[in-house]
């Protein structure tokens, strides 16, 4: 019984000692603060103005996500554009994300960052690209059909075999001398 009591006291002493060595704030240093979370959905113009100021936006540009129960709160609804569309030569505070300090990030930034979806406009419209692709495929199918209907072969001579045209292999009599086959003329 005394050994068990000593073991419990030892564990309690170790827990108290480790609390004094490690700062208590180290555990929560990586968590998001209360100011980083979206607030409640703005209902009045004053709440909209306060939310726009919170996200460093003008009141005219601020548009929150609809209050449909998804938990967006007062977070601004930014355009669905990828980071590719932002100026690469601008001096960004975070060049990897092409963001400045204090600028609100898109709610789905993990989808619209530079190594994922690129929403940049394409140089050609979709129907032109589809016409080019399907036109090329139709041309290749047509050419394969033409090659199948009108085959082209390299001109070849009759097959030549060594050892007097394989006389013994084709069942010739080994006691007789086969007739000499000449494959060339000089």
Swiss-Prot record:
Transmembrane feature ranges: 133-153
UniProt transit peptide range: 1-28
Mitochondrion among keywords: yes
InterPro entries associated with the record: NDUFB8, Ndufb8_metazoa
Entry GO CC: mitochondrial inner membrane; respiratory chain complex I
Top-level division of the source organism's lineage: Eukaryota
Gene Ontology biological process terms from the UniProt entry: mitochondrial electron transport, NADH to ubiquinone
Entries under Pfam families matching the protein: NDUF_B8 (PF05821)
Subcellular location: Mitochondrion inner membrane
Record key words, sorted: Electron transport, Membrane, Mitochondrion, Mitochondrion inner membrane, Respiratory chain, Transit peptide, Transmembrane, Transmembrane helix, Transport
Lipid bilayer topology: Single-pass membrane protein
Sequence similarity: Belongs to the complex I NDUFB8 subunit family.
Function of the molecule: Accessory subunit of the mitochondrial membrane respiratory chain NADH dehydrogenase (Complex I), that is believed not to be involved in catalysis. Complex I functions in the transfer of electrons from NADH to the respiratory chain. The immediate electron acceptor for the enzyme is believed to be ubiquinone.
Subunit structure, interactors included: Complex I is composed of 45 different subunits.
Listed name of the protein: NADH dehydrogenase [ubiquinone] 1 beta subcomplex subunit 8, mitochondrial
Gene: NDUFB8
């Amino acid at each position: 019984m005394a050994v068990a009591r000593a073991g419990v006291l030892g564990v309690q002493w170790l827990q108290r000692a480790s609390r004094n060595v490690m700062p208590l704030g180290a555990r929560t240093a990586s968590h998001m603060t209360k100011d980083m979370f979206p607030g409640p959905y703005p209902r009045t113009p004053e709440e909209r103005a306060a939310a726009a100021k919170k996200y460093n936006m003008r009141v005219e540009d601020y548009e929150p996500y609809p209050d449909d129960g998804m938990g967006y709160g007062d977070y601004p609804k930014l355009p669905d554009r990828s980071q590719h569309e932002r100026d690469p030569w601008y001096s960004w505070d975070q060049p990897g994300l092409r963001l400045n300090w204090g600028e609100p990030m898109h709610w789905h930034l993990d989808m619209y960052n530079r190594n994922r979806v690129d929403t940049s406009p394409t140089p050609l419209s979709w129907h032109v690209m589809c016409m080019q692709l399907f036109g090329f495929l139709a041309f290749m199918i047509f050419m394969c059909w033409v090659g199948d209907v009108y085959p082209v072969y390299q001109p070849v001579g009759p097959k030549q075999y060594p050892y007097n045209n394989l006389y013994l292999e084709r069942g010739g009599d080994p006691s007789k001398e086969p007739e000499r086959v000449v494959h060339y003329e000089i």
